Structure formats: C-alpha cells, structure tokens
C-alpha cells in the first residue's frame, strides 16, 4: 500500500487517501465523478463528499464488502455504510475529520486518467493517477442535474466544466437523462421527459435575470469571494455557448 494518511487526519487528507487507495485497489474500475472531478480540475468550489461509479458492475452489493474492507485499513476509523436504492453511502470519520463517500454502479462509463496534482500537493503528498468520469459526460449529467433540481450549484458546475475545463456535453448521455427525468420539484415532478429545445428555453430563462447577489446567497459557503465577483455574466455567456451546442442537432 502506497497511499498515506497523515494523523491527525484532515478532511482533504481523507479525500486524498480514498482517491489514491481506491485507485490502487480497484484500478480503472473506481471512477470519480461529481464535485471531486471539478476539484481535480482546479475548481475552487468546496465539496463535502466524494462520488464514485464502479464499473462494470450490476449491483452495489458486489462492491460494498470490498469498500468497507479498504476503509477499515485506517486505524481507529469509524465507518457507517448504508445501502440505498440509488447509491451506497459510506460515512468515514478519523480523528476529528469526516467525509462521505457515495457510490453507485454501471456496466460502462467513459473515463479519462487524471493526476491528483495540485490537490495532492496541497495536502503534502505526491500526485497519483486516478480515473475520472469524462468531462463531456460529467457536463451532460450536470446539465441534467440542474434541469431536475434547479440548483445554482449545478449551474456553476456546468459553467466550470464548459468554460474553464473546455468540455462539450455528451449529447447521447444528455438525451438519455432527458428521456427519463426524475424531479421532485412541484412544477417538474409530473414531467418524465423533456426535449432539448425546451431545456434550452429553461436554461436561457434561468440565466437571463441571474445576478451576482443570487449566486452569493446560495454559493457563498462553497465559493471564495473572488470567484463570485462577476460570476453571473460568466455563467450567462457559458450557458449561451452550451445551448448553441444543444441546438446543433436540428432533430431535437
């Protein structure tokens, strides 16, 4: 085992240990997704959990025992694992630090290798190579997540992936998500599918009147002040670029 954990543990130290150790144990089968992908792409957005997709598996029960076994390698770790219908949730507490690991499974997922780079160095450890969900697939899922939840956090993540990471959404993945919408919002929960054309209208309407004050009220706890300044117009420009791509296929 080459993954190291300094004690007393810190939250970022736990994140890094999980990323490095999972890469050692599960190799290309453990794929990081969600907010930690943005963190590895140098996003300043804070995150309190780390999301994984394990491939190629058909059931979370196939991985739960191995995940717990790996986490118990940490001396005196407090581990709580729950299996939900849509995910496996593992709480990990070491010393005074705690993180949450959320995982689900899939038979396939487009991935790319990524160095833990600056994040690892910020914790005082050398970089290692991990697997992350392809940024284009991540962007497609983030657009779909915004559509179902309407959170400004998701809109920021779309902006970051498109403008700062240079990703274009995987339209096949997005179309699959739009074809089986699952929203709990009152105005959307009865809607089970959406066209790209309507999604574009919803995105443009949401960003047309977006202000820095709106973003600050929701994102001040997870973004530094220098990232919030002028963010509304940056998101608006990015969303306009995304919608142009979404409308590129005239059949949708």
Enumerate the predicted regions with their spans.
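Structured mid-to-C-terminal alpha-helical surface segments
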Residues: 1-31, 38-50, 54-252
């Amino acid at each position: 085992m080459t993954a190291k954990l300094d004690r007393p543990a810190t939250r970022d130290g736990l994140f890094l240990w999980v990323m490095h150790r999972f890469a050692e144990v599960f190799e290309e089968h453990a794929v990081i997704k969600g907010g930690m992908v943005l963190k590895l792409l140098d996003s300043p957005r804070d995150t309190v959990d780390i999301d994984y997709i394990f491939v190629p598996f058909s059931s979370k029960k196939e991985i739960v025992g191995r995940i717990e076994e790996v986490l118990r390698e940490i001396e005196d770790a407090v581990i709580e694992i729950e299996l939900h219908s849509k995910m496996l949730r593992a709480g990990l507490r070491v010393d005074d630090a705690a993180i949450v690991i959320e995982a689900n499974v899939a038979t396939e997922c487009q991935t790319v290798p990524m160095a833990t780079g600056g994040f690892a160095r910020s914790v005082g450890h050398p970089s290692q190579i991990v697997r992350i969900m392809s940024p284009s697939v991540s962007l497609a899922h983030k657009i779909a997540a915004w559509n179902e939840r309407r959170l400004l956090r998701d809109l920021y993540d779309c902006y970051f992936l498109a403008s700062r990471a240079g990703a274009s959404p995987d339209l096949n993945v997005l179309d699959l998500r739009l074809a089986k919408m699952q929203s709990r919002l009152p105005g959307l929960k009865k809607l089970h599918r959406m066209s790209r054309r309507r999604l574009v209208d919803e995105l443009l309407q949401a960003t047309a009147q977006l202000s820095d004050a709106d973003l600050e009220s929701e994102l001040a706890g997870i973004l530094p002040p220098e990232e919030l300044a002028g963010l509304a117009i940056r998101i608006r420009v990015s969303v306009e670029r995304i919608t142009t791509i979404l409308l590129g296929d005239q059949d949708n």
